[in-house]
Amino acid sequence: MSEMITVGDAIARTLEQYHVEAIYGVISIHNLPIADAVGQRGNIRFVPARGEAGSVTMADAHGRFSGLGVALTSTGAGAGNAVGALVEAMNACTPLLHLTGQVEKAWLDADTGFIHETRDQLTFLKASSKRAYRISNANQAIAILQDRKSVV
């Protein structure tokens, strides 16, 4: 029987394979599965930021000097707060991975004002990044992260 892993675990394990040393971010209810998996594994340092733009700016600097920079932001308005810094990193061709959560599937794209929901988050992330994906399971997370074009 194959091992069942969460999306958060899949992300943490794959980032370790890329020798990611640090994730810069803001913790929120919708990205806790990723943050928890990273914390439980203990191989990647979490560097807290005061805001999402700051987390992406720190990841941008890390990417420019040391390889892949990784930012973890809140969903919805939090991810929106990261947009300016994402555009800067994209224009500089910085190797950067921005991770954010999403609202529960029952509320996804419902446009009801559910906590941290924003209308069509994926579209504004596509406009401010080289690529953006909505991940729905661990296998999809692994496949996207292992495709080098998705990560840099």
PLM regions with names:
Residues 1-152:
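N-terminal alpha/beta PP-like core and its mobile active-site loop of ThDP/TPP-dependent enzymes
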